[in-house]
Structures are given as C-alpha cells and as structure tokens.
C-alpha cells in the first residue's frame, strides 16, 4: 500500500459498514481469546475486537497503516474512562509490520512473553487481502502460516473476490466515484487470466469551502482464485470447511471462507 494512500485510507473507506462486517464475523467468533488480524490496515476491526475484550495482534505490510492504527487505539485508551484504559491497554494488543505469508506469532498475552510461537484462537483476514497475494503459491504459504499460527479447533475467516467483481464495479473498465470529500477514478486492466491491475486516481478536497484538491495515485494488483480450488487446497492443508458464505451488503462477488483447524 502506497505511503500517501495510507494517510487518506479512512476517508476512502468512510462508507464501509464496519459494524455490519464485524457483526458478520462475530457469528463465528463465539468465545473470548486471542485474534490475529492479518492485513489489519488502519485498525478498524482491532478497535472493535478490543472493545469486546479480545487480545489482538494486528499485522500489516504498511508501516504507515500501522501508525494510523496505533493513533486510533491510543485515542480510545486516553479518553479518560478507566474501562477504556484497560480494554485498549498496551498489554492487550500488538501491531507488527510483516508480510502475512511470512508472519509467525510470538506474542503471548497470557504469560507476557514474546520469544516463541504462540498460537491464536482465531485468525481473520478481511477486505479480500488474499487477492493481493501474487499467485497461488503465495496463497499456499498464507494457509500454511495460518495453520501454524492457529490452535487446534481454531477458526480462520477470510474473504476473496471472484471475477464477477470487475463486471459488478467497472463499466468499460472505468469506475467513477464522486463523494463530497473526494472523487476517485478507477481504471481496470486484465493482465492475464487471473491477474488484474487497478489504477486509482483519488482527488481529496483540501477545504470544504473551496475547489482545491490534492491528488493521490494508487496501483493495485489482484489475483483471482477459483473458489473450488481454495476449498480443495485448504482441505489438504489441515482445515475443514466450517462454512462458506456471501453477504449481498458486501457485494455478491465476495465469498467468505470460514475454516476450522483440524
């Protein structure tokens, strides 16, 4: 994720229903424990998990994203309420800059240790983060690391988008999004059968009283998986399919995979 883009990510994601998404996740996360949030971005789900009494390790490749997440958590911790200081205390979370295909969790909240592998109760990976992996080989590494980082009978929940997203969003490979705070122009190009490039020009209004905008440019590459391949692959890597689901509120082209470690 581009450093500049991290600075305005929350403006860009302002209209996402985080609470609705979080409530969807909580259908499968029943008991308190430790959660790994892979590709945590600016920490919106971390805030909600901490509020509900979980311990959380947030992992992201963008240092700038993690800096924003840290500021959000600190703001919650310093709001003056004793309960908030406890829920959002530094002993309840850890933010780690790392690629999710390489990450091995060593954060042991219970024993206050950080020197050996510590398996989590749950792993979540939201907003089609797995589609930003380069190819199926990287997805295999991701699944293997998740298996290593997860307790037996623990749950891994991630979502992936299908080819349909490009028909859903782009008309003639262009998508225009105009909001009071910004205007964005998305351009889509298919690089190969499963690889797609998306270039985003984002214009953020500097002041609501004038027409001065600041321009940001972001280039993203998505790899699209065959859902049947995902199901077969994870079953061969120590997981069972607990459920698969879609939620029209988050787009028909998005599939949620809920896996249980054997």
For each predicted feature, which ranges?
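A short glycine-rich, Lys/Arg-flanked "PGG" loop and its adjoining helix->strand segment in the class I
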Residues: 140-152
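A short acidic, Gly/Pro-enriched loop at the edge of an enzyme's catalytic core
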Residues: 106-122
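Core SAM-dependent methyltransferase catalytic element
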Residues: 237, 248, 252-262
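Class I SAM-dependent methyltransferase SAM/SAH-binding core
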Residues: 44-103
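Conserved class I S-adenosyl-L-methionine
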Residues: 1-30, 32-41, 44
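SAM-dependent methyltransferase
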Residues: 137, 157-228
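A short SAM/SAH-binding and catalytic strip from SAM-dependent methyltransferases
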Residues: 122-137
């Amino acid at each position: 994720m581009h450093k500049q883009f991290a600075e305005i990510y929350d403006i860009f994601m302002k209209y996402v229903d985080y609470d609705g998404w979080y409530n969807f996740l909580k259908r499968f996360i029943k008991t308190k424990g430790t959660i790994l949030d892979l590709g945590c971005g600016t920490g919106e789900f971390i805030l909600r998990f901490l509020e509900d009494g979980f311990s959380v390790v947030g992992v992201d490749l963008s240092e700038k994203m993690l800096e924003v997440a840290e500021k959000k958590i600190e703001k919650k911790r310093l709001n003056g309420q004793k309960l908030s200081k406890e829920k959002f205390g530094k002993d309840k979370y850890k933010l780690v800059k790392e690629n999710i295909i390489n990450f091995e969790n060593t954060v042991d909240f219970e024993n206050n240790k950080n020197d050996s592998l510590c398996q989590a109760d749950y792993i979540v990976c939201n907003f089609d983060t797995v589609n930003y992996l380069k190819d199926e080989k990287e997805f295999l590494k991701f699944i293997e690391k998740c298996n290593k980082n997860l307790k037996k009978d623990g749950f891994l929940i991630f979502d992936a988008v299908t080819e349909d997203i490009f028909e859903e969003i782009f008309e003639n490979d262009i998508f225009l999004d105009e909001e009071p705070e910004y205007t964005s122009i998305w351009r889509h190009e298919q690089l190969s059968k499963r690889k797609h490039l998306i270039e985003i020009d984002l214009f953020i209004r500097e002041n609501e009283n004038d027409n001065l905008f600041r321009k940001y440019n972001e280039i993203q590459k998505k790899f699209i998986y065959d859902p049947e391949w995902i199901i077969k692959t994870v079953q061969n890597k120590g997981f069972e399919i607990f459920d698969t689901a879609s939620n029209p509120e988050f787009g028909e082209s998005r599939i949620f995979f809920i896996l249980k470690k054997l």
